[in-house]
Amino acid sequence: MKRFFELLIQYKYLILALFIAISGFGYKAYINIPVDAFPDITPKQVVIYTESAGNSAEDIEKLITYPIEAAMSGLPGVKMILSNSIFGLSYVSIFFEDDYDTYLLRQLVTERLNTIDIPKGWGTPVMGPNTTGLGQVVWYALKDKENRYTPSQLRSIHEYTVVPLFKAVDGVEEVISWGGYEKQYEVLIDPLRLQNVDVSYNEILEALEKSNQSVGGQYLEFNREQYLIRGHGLYQSLDDIRNTVIRTKDAKAVTIQDVATVQEGKAPRFGAVSVDGKERVFGMVLQRSATNAAKVVKELKEKMPLVNAALPKGITLEIIYDRTQITHKAVSTMTNALLMGSVLVAIVLFLFLFELRSAFIVILSLPISLLIAFLLMQKYGISANLMSLSGLAIAIGMIVDGTIVVVENAFRLLHDNPDASRAGVIAEATAEVAKPVLFALLIIATVFIPLLSLEGLAGKLYTPMALDIVFVMLGSLAVALLLVPVLSFMLLKRSKHVNSPLMSGIKYIYTPVLKLSLKYAKTLVGITFLLFFALAYLLSQQGREFMPELNEESIMYRVIAIPGTALTQSVENAQAIEKFILKTYPKQVDSVLSMIGRSEKGETAQANYMEVLLTLNPEFKEIDSLGKKMTQQLKKKFAHLQFVPTQPIAMRIEELLEGVSAELAVKIYGEDQKVMSTIASDIAKVLKGIQGLDHAEVETQLGQAQINIKPNYLALSRYGLKVEDVMKVIRYGVGEEPITQKIEGVKRFGIVAKLKDATQDINTLKSLILRSDSGRVVTLKEVCDISVIQGPAFIKREDLSRYMVLSLEVEERDIASFVEEANTKIEKNVNIPDGYYIKWAGDFKNMQEATQTLAMIIPITLLIITLLLYTAFNSFKKAFLILLGVPLGLMGGIVALLIADIYLSVSAIVGFIAIFAIAILNGIVLVSFIDDLRQKFPTVKTIDLVKDATLLRLRPVLMTAFTTLFGILPLLFATGVGSEIQYPLSVVVTGGIISSTLLTLLVLPGLYVLFFKKT
């Protein structure tokens, strides 16, 4: 091995050139790496939505949703199918295993869609945009400064001017329009005039459809020239519609204008958008899957001037929400922690080494290792985000460990061998420590294998972190064993090393303490392990949660009214809320946006639902206290509405993973919605007295008022009417389904044949006049049974089974103990009939999955580490000795967790895994050096050798500890966006480093003496 390092030194300029090139590519990767707030946590999914205008949730479930679910359930890789059937829409989301290609899945879904038999006229299933659940990168609104345009005009301007320009931006998958009104042309039929001219409604439909068409007649040749023949019969004006002939009677044409008024109108809408008390037209940009959100937003903003120039005078675009704002805040939090950690590590290194050249070599290894990590991140498609950058921040102190060992050994041997060849001495020094350095860094990488095994949300969050730690440790290994020998040869001198004042002081205090610890080794070891078991018991009693809530520095509410609330009423509610907030908090809140109901593209919200987002004054920082105070005031002021505080990204994550808009929920499965509702209400009552439950909300799937029109077949036959005649009147005359379109350039607007006053009230609807082809006239109520009933507002399904959600808000209590107590009470007090069952969803399920996976993988990882340690030391005894150092490190982590009074979460478990790595590293450094001394001085007593070796290794052990500690401290004290997610991790690691270092220096030497006293 020595020869290998001599060759490296011989070809030193080649090695330098190689690392300069690698650093250059690494820097290029760094500046081009995609930036995002989070890793892409979206499961592989394909959404299918089917617009079925005017149809009820029950009918849509039976005729559309179920056939789609049944067809898709047999596709390869399907994990779960969620669906929601609501008035006018079927929404089916198919979740796949993550190792499938998105475009292959969309192709498979397309093939299956072609086999589904949906009844004619019930809509066409369409695949949703190829985006992620967090794909909403920009929200904006059209601002009409002079109030010159109608809501319909603004909607048309948006759809035909703004949308095409934004969709042309690379990475934009879809632009959704919301708010305003879609323009349509109305043929407003007067039933009395219709009666006078003896024309049926069916004839009007047929006339409109057949009169608006364009055909081609091939071509003719004339005078050696070819002329194309076109039959251009498309409607050009409203007069064309008015003059459309319905039928000819007594040589006189009956036209549309004889029975109807033709005018511009508004299509039925299912949602609206209000900003600061005024309705607005709103746009939502969705990024394509696997694209760079920051780049997409940047290009959208660059296109803004062009879009504003294309808009009519007086209209501008106003950005309301930009996801890169939280992205930059989150990344800035981690970047600042990384930079500050690097600076602190550099200071620590100089204070301990007290020699500029050595310190320079070690400090230089930091950026080079990080650049190698960025190069590998780019290679494997990992973005710079909150989780991946925190992995680098955790590893910042460990990066230099290998370099420290190599440089320190090289410096010592150069001083001890003044006459020997510099190249030979440095090669020998590197060869001496190469094996422990190699195995130490490999073991550190191995320690993080459990994180790579996590699945679901935990896997998507923590896998990038683990990979980044592995990448940067591989980079540091390459630097320590390839570059550092070359730099040591070029920079280190043979001058006598002067101990730093810091090290001299520490050694002065530590030496007598070490002697005492060796003298009373058995007692110290016994007390230590008793203390460990006591702390382990306390940890088992600590509350558990999946992960701390991300503070997005925003305030948002889900607002829910009673089912069946009209859209106009919801708009009034929204505007009242907006005005109240702006009046009450003029200094803190700049603007309030309300998204009511749904857009016309695959959203599933009802008219009784809205999302309210506040734009806060950038100068205002006390967001938490403001949110709590505001929530109380809103609940008091608008007692008839339900306010659920949330945040934009958090809400999308919750909905995305389980179809549940809550951190914790109970899903009730079964067939009958009334039975499920009863079970949910019973559970809510039982849970009411449990400590920590702030609010329980039963999903109100029932309660939608419906007017049922059921044909009376006997009465229809008496009047010569067909069921089809009645259904066409309901579908087109009442429901306003477009019959044809008026094309205006690239614009398309529906033409509807609407019965005048048909939807004025129920009595008017009952009195609608029907005319048979034979001329018989009758009202709707004479041939149909018309009743008002309560039906489902929506029907949710999971894997072909209906379910209902009971959402729970738990405050000031951990999720795990709450669920444990709740389960006990439910089993004792709630009667769940046969065919019905419940499941917990949300954070508890994620936490369960993560802990079960870790419980299985960590023992396997321990076995791998044991084998690596055995390979390094050729002794199971020494491997076991080093592994005994792990509990010593865990003790400090447990104490820190208990003192900070935070729950045991996946983030905290990651901290314990990091301590595992640090403890093993300390053990390897110390044990390998003791072994070296025992080989050189076989006749010296073990206890004396251990004492000398520990004192000699004091500096590298302390440097390892302090660099890791100071590397993690900025993460511990960070206060920006995302810091709360890594806080448990940094608390645990900080405590673990302190205990691991103290106990490695006090207990491990004694353990070594006890293990090898007789050898």
Q: Where do the PLM segments sit?
A:
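Cytosolic juxtamembrane regions of multi-pass inner-membrane proteins
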Residues: 306-310, 327-336, 352-354, 382-439, ...
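Transmembrane alpha-helices and their membrane-interface boundaries in multi-pass membrane transporters
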Residues: 385, 396-410, 433-453, 460-498, ...
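Membrane-proximal extracytoplasmic
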Residues: 1-342, 384, 460, 631, ...
